[in-house]
C-alpha cells in the first residue's frame, strides 16, 4: 500500500511540474518584423536571407535553407543560422532547425533555436515572398541556467 501511495504522489508531482513548465502559446515572449533581403533558388531547395528588429534581440540577421519533402513544394524542412546584434553591442548566435508550410506566396516557418547564451526558443515566422515581409513571434522554452 505504501508503494502505491508513493507512486501516486510521484505521478501527481510529475503532472504538477509538467503543467507548471508548460508554455503559454497565447503570450509570446517577444515579436519582431523582418525583411527578406535575398532569395536564391536551387535545384534541391531555396535559401532566404532575412534582417530586422526583434524584441529583446536587437537587429537579427538570418539565413534559412528550405528543402521540400513533397512534389508541390508545400511543406518541408528548414535549417539555418541567425546572428542577433544586441543594442549593447553583444551578439547572440543560434542554429535553426524546423519545418515549413507554404500556401501560394505565404510561408509559415516553425523552428527552435538554441542560443549561445543558453536560452532555447520556439519560433514562428509568417513570411510573404512577394511583399518580402515577415512577422514573427517567439516563446522562451528554456531560460538561462
Question: Predicted regions: what is each one?
Answer:
Residues 1-8:
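Bacterial N-terminal signal peptides that target proteins for export
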